[in-house]
Amino acid sequence: MKLSKSLAIFLLGASTMLASTLIEKATTSGLKAIPSDEAKLMKMIDDKNDPITKEKVELGKKLYFDPRISKSGLISCNTCHNLGLGGADGVPAAIGHGWTMNPHHLNSPTVYNSVFFKAQFWDGRSPHLADQAQGPVQAGPEMAAPASLVEQRINSIPEYVEEFKGAYGKDVKVDFAKITATIATFEKTLVTPSKFDKFLSGNDKALNKEEKEGLNTFIDKGCASCHTGIALGGTMQPFELAAKYKLQA
């Protein structure tokens, strides 16, 4: 009985040590956790020049789901970055204004955790979310709405005007940049902390045995060389390095 109890204690201690070792292995491999603590998360995603507030987030959410910011009045941000479909569109190539397929055969990247991206769009041409939000709204194959049209429509809706005043003050100028920046503020809140992040933060019980084995293999096989950082976002990598890209229609 004493031997069995001692063995159980030994195995438990060994298991805890292995988990702690795996946490260290993961973090030293470059994997980073999304903070589950709201204060730590806000410190990471907030902008002192345009602080996140409840009013801005709620207003940005309405704009995100509003098709009136597209030329046709049919397409919203959520049309392509569907929050119920992983923040993406789930099709081989995005479909935009006039049922136009993306000319570069690209689908929509997820909006979830995009606040952690060092650059936006597949090619990284945009430095941050507020800048990125301006692109699809105006792009011909996407929402096809000139900035002036978006401004006219939003300013013609009294409820929106009042909400902008509530979010930014009574003297706010509701222009295109302010509209898209407000959408970006909502997008900043679309983060998905998980049990994987809890594990990286030091909770060795957050993952089960099979998940830990998978993480260990993920690191040992070199997957973490590219898929690293926070939310496994990785870094910008050269395209077609191994082989020529072939479109699968």
For each feature predicted by the language model, list its residue ranges.
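Accessory helical subdomains and C-terminal extensions of nucleic-acid helicases
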Residues: 142-143
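Second-shell loop/turn segments in exported
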Residues: 46-49, 66, 138-139, 148-151, ...
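C-terminal capping alpha-helices of c-type cytochrome domains
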Residues: 147-194
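Bacterial N-terminal signal peptides
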Residues: 8-17
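Short glycine/threonine-rich turn/loop motifs
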Residues: 22-135, 197-249
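Generic hydrophobic/packing signal
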Residues: 14, 115, 133-137, 154, ...
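Generic hydrophobic, aliphatic-rich segments that mediate packing or membrane embedding
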Residues: 73-76, 107, 125, 146, ...
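Positively charged n-region of N-terminal signal peptides that target proteins for export
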Residues: 1-6
